């Protein structure tokens, strides 16, 4: 760890380069995960999340807390579990990137900044998915719940960052 961090918790040159590379690779993974057409991924089951509205080639899930509101409309407990798992993975979608950016970018190091930047990242992802649906029929879904779950992930990353920084100061 001494090769990556100085005694005060700041990065060494190698640490900064490593963190920047990891953030770039993870950002690329997010792009591939969020923007490739849905049909490129294996479909484990013919499953549709309840509450989705289709307008032409656009897929929207405008219901806040859809898992709770429409949870009674799924066919099985396993399908409900699949929906909950999707929400959990959305919480952690931006977590690693935000965590790395907190170390790299001083302007990110407040709760207000994390809330703003993470929400904007999430909104960009969702709007880009709509654009891709219009352009190439990617069958992506704009989900209101993704906005708050991704933002919550950013807040959790901020909490972990603060714990680590606090540990260095002890």
List each model region and its residues:
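Bulky hydrophobic segments
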Residues: 1-139, 158-170
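Alpha-helical transmembrane segments that form the membrane-embedded catalytic/substrate-binding core
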Residues: 141-161
């Amino acid at each position: 760890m001494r090769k990556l961090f100085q005694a005060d918790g700041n990065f060494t040159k190698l640490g900064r380069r490593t963190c920047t590379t990891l953030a770039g690779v993870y950002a690329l993974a997010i792009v591939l995960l969020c923007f490739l057409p849905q049909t490129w991924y294996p479909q484990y089951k013919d499953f549709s999340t309840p509450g989705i509205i289709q307008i032409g080639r656009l897929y929207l899930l405008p219901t806040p807390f859809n898992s709770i509101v429409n949870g009674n409309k799924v066919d099985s407990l396993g399908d409900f579990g699949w929906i909950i798992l999707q929400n959990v993975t959305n919480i952690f979608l931006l977590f690693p990137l935000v965590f790395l950016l907190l170390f790299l970018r001083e302007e990110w190091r407040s709760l207000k900044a994390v809330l703003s930047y993470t929400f904007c990242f999430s909104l960009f992802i969702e709007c880009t998915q709509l654009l891709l649906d219009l352009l190439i029929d990617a069958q992506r879904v704009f989900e209101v719940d993704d906005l708050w779950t991704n933002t919550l992930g950013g807040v959790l990353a901020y909490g972990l960052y603060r714990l680590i920084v606090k540990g260095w100061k002890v």
